[in-house]
């Protein structure tokens, strides 16, 4: 099932996850809303509700209790008129194994995926270097933490996931030609880009 595959790709902290309800759009194009952290595991219904749009949009904390991740993201916060195709062309030119998704506000979420769990510090360092190489130094990097203090209630920061209400979603991945990828096409983009721990 699509929800199972999607949840496997976006594995993260099991103990908590985020939800986000959009309330209005600001002048700069960024959408504002109510973010919440739920300190409970996700269920199959949580994932299915995200993809169908019948439940809340969810966000995942990429770093797990062992301080490892299976994905990370460069969050490029440029909203109005952002040129995703230009970014895609640069990624292709540099032969980087990345998947670009449109964020909820029209910016870009640039994902690096790992087949297995990898140290949050290694992934964060790699994405920081890639961000600078792409010309977006200073962009927010997920995972934001390299170590969680779960015993102190620290669950880290979540990233809003793509493909909310996937059949009508504006939070889609981009194909190489700049067109929107369906959820099934996203799975193909993931398979083409996912790296081993050694490659990262």
Map each language-model feature to its residues.
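Active-site-adjacent loop/helix surface patches within enzyme catalytic domains
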Residues: 73-76, 84-102
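Short, solvent-exposed beta-strand edge segments and adjacent coil->beta transition regions
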Residues: 69-73, 107-109
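Short secondary-structure junctions
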Residues: 17-21, 96-100, 138-139
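DNA replication initiation on ssDNA origins
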Residues: 1-71, 81-89, 157-158, 163-166, ...
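Histidine-centered divalent-metal-coordination microenvironment in nucleic-acid enzymes
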Residues: 98-123, 149-162
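Helical (often loop-to-helix) elements that flank the catalytic cores of nucleotide-handling enzymes
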Residues: 83-93, 113-140, 167-187
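Short beta-strand
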Residues: 61-63, 98-105, 140-144
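Short, charged/polar micro-motifs that form catalytic or ligand-binding hotspots
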Residues: 64, 76-81, 109-117
């Amino acid at each position: 099932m699509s929800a199972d595959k999607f949840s496997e790709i976006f594995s993260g902290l099991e103990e908590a996850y985020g939800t986000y309800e959009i309330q209005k759009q600001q002048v700069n194009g960024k959408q504002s809303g109510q973010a919440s952290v739920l300190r409970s595991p996700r269920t199959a219904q949580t994932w299915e509700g995200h993809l169908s749009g019948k439940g809340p949009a969810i966000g995942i904390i990429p770093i797990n209790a062992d301080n490892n991740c299976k994905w990370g993201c460069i969050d490029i916060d440029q909203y109005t008129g952002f040129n995703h195709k230009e970014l895609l062309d640069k990624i292709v030119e540099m032969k980087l194994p990345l998947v670009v998704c449109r964020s909820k506000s029209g910016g870009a979420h640039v994902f690096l995926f790992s087949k297995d769990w990898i140290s949050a510090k290694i992934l964060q360092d790699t994405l920081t270097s890639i961000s600078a190489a792409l010309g977006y130094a200073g962009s927010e990097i997920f995972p934001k933490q390299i170590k969680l203090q779960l015993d102190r209630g620290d669950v880290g920061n979540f990233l809003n996931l793509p493909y909310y209400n996937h059949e009508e979603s504006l939070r889609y991945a981009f194909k190489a030609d700049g067109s929107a990828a369906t959820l099934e096409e996203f799975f193909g983009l993931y398979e083409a880009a996912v790296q081993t721990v050694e490659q990262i």
